[in-house]
């Protein structure tokens, strides 16, 4: 067992059941064009829909987590008509240009030049050392600053965040995400959780958001979804966001055969 392994080894290295399933699939159907589907993809989608919290029963697969983040950002624009986002400083959502725009690590942003417009950032609610020196677990200073940014910008389409900071394993205050969910609902802002490295049982529950009794509008998963052998990710949303059937939200060559 590798407790790091880039967060892909929930079932260890080369688990026999995963290896055998991949071999069987290669014998049956090694590739599926993106314009079609296949029974294996359908079965996986149904399984994830059954496991997912709330109404997150619609999904689109992608060949990697960064790709799925890009799909979430595009869907948020289609759904709200707004392009602005709020995300956290020091967060990580991938290394592509759109992902580092919403990400907050200087390692990926430094000297790159102009990033995506409308990518607003706020400090994360770190326990005991947050930017606003909040005196207790309520983190009123962090919440009030979020409200301030929402009010001043006025046209935020989505808030995207890691419900649990994974690189440094930052545990958020228990009620923080409930308060964020309320702010999003009051301002018609979509809440997107990036659980690419943390979902699928790594925290004792299938999804991190279940620890906080909060269901996002979109949930992005990946890494361990590919069994530690091949890259795979998925964007899960509720059925109200199934609105772009006539457009290429993903359109990745291997989105149906990853």
Tell where the protein language model's regions lie, with residue ranges:
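Conserved N-terminal phosphate-binding loop of PLP-dependent enzymes in the Aspartate aminotransferase
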Residues: 1-258
